[in-house]
Amino acid sequence: MPLYLKAEKIQSWRVLIMACAGFIFNTTEFVPVAMLSDIAQSFDMQTADTGLMMTVYAWTVLIMSLPAMLATGNMERKSLLIKLFIIFIVGHILSVIAWNFWILLLARMCIALAHSVFWSITASLVMRISPKHKKTQALGMLAIGTALATILGLPIGRIVGQLVGWRVTFGIIAVLALSIMFLIIRLLPNLPSKNAGSIASLPLLAKRPLLLWLYVTTAIVISAHFTAYTYIEPFMIDVGHLDPNFATAVLLVFGFSGIAASLLFNRLYRFAPTKFIVVSMSLLMFSLLLLLFSTETIIAMFSLVFIWGIGISCIGLSLQMRVLKLAPDATDVATAIYSGIFNAGIGAGALFGNLATTYLGLNEIGYTGAALGLIGFIIFITTHLKYRHTFLLQNK
């Protein structure tokens, strides 16, 4: 095998390892969605109240993303990844032995700390270790890893939780994380910090209105999604009257939609980035608006969830790629801010979903999310029209 092909194969394996790391981080972030009812029963709580686990996790990431990124900005990336995985594993061990809900929240905050740095560096890191001329495909591979978290992580986590308890689910995640950490130690090269940015980058980024409005759009649109998604399990069971096994199958469909979104992103995004985002947001709003109606038949719900998953997955990929293009001189800092704001959206969405469930009823979460999605859509369109020339320059 020619040396350049051998080197490219090794690089591809490294990208795959990072995709597996993304899988495990995304699995643990969202697996509580599939186990809210079981966790609530364990601690004798209301399901809506245990949904605040998502809020605490997300807001920990929001608060810590930028300061943690600045504190670790000059660290060699391989050693930083290893330290993050150690924190991640310790957090899951604490989750397994949590003797009350507050200890579980503390464990989730520990995991969220590792998350805050991991997702700040991962996108730019994957671009660095990927083969030449395959940067977009590498980001797509990372996206597939995160999508598989929904396909495999959430349904399997739910099944394990139902059979032997939610604590075992967190224990299995810890074991998988340990395995991935050993692969990182063995296969990843030393990676000095590069174009990470520093605290001096903040005033420069603040002078880029297109980037700032992109952050605002991200917060609102992600809030719209998680207003409904956080409570999708109790919605399907209590409102849709689905058997719990069908609820697991719906989560599986959502995950497969993430892979479809990754393929669409790889093929279509580069040709018309703005149109791609507009269509993706439209799919999200359409799905949330019709969520309640989809409970009439199983086929309707499966179809709607698939479309919903494509919409939100394409939005996440597109906005992250846009951030990287708008801040090539400070990728890690810009991505850290994006990660924090993304998780602010998750936390806000979980909170809005909780409020909608408490004061309006569980059946109203789709309408609440759709209203938020419309606000985000209007902001994005308005921003695009105002900074049209900047959009065109950034995509030349």
Swiss-Prot record:
Keywords: Cell inner membrane, Cell membrane, Membrane, Sugar transport, Transmembrane, Transmembrane helix, Transport. SUPFAM superfamilies: MFS general substrate transporter. Gene3D superfamilies: MFS general substrate transporter like domains (1.20.1250.20). It comes from Haemophilus influenzae (strain PittGG). This is Probable sugar efflux transporter. InterPro entries: MFS, MFS_dom, MFS_Efflux_Transporters, MFS_trans_sf, Sugar_effux_transptr_put. Coiled coil: none annotated. The keyword Transport applies. Belongs to the major facilitator superfamily. SotB (TC 2.A.1.2) family. Its main location: membrane. GO terms for molecular function: carbohydrate transmembrane transporter activity. The chain crosses the membrane at residues 15-35, 51-71, 84-104, 109-129, 137-157, 168-188, 209-229, 245-265, 276-296, 297-317, 333-353, 365-385. It is a multi-pass membrane protein.
